Design a protein with these regions (language model features):
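Short alpha-helical "recognition helix" segments of helix-turn-helix
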Residues: 19-22, 49
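DNA major-groove recognition helix of helix-turn-helix/homeodomain DNA-binding modules
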Residues: 44-59
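Helix-turn-helix DNA-binding elements, focusing on the entry/boundary residues of the two helices
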Residues: 17, 28, 46
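Short amphipathic recognition helices of helix-turn-helix/homeodomain-type DNA-binding modules
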Residues: 59-65
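Recognition helix of helix-turn-helix/homeodomain-like DNA-binding domains
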Residues: 26-41
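A short, Lys/Arg-rich alpha-helix, primarily the initiator
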Residues: 1-15, 62
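Residues in the recognition helix of alpha-helical DNA-binding motifs
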Residues: 9, 23, 34, 63
Length: 65
């Protein structure tokens, strides 16, 4: 995951890590593990994040692939 691309989008929507974690139904510790590069988002979470921020397919690819 490219957090350098996702973070500005989150901030533009007024979200911090804990806000996004809650919005997608993930615990903060699990979110932090992924955020810090020790895991990856499952497809269901990628879909929820993409919907929340109205990400284009290109943005999804650049952030998560």
């Amino acid at each position: 995951m490219n957090k350098e691309l996702l973070e500005p989008i989150m901030r533009a929507h007024g979200d911090k890590n804990k806000d996004l974690a809650a919005a997608i139904g993930m615990s903060v510790p699990n979110f932090s593990t992924i955020w810090n590069g020790r895991g990856e988002f499952a497809l269901k979470y990628i879909r929820l994040i993409a919907r929340r921020y109205s990400l284009t397919p290109e943005q999804v690819y650049k952030i998560f692939i």
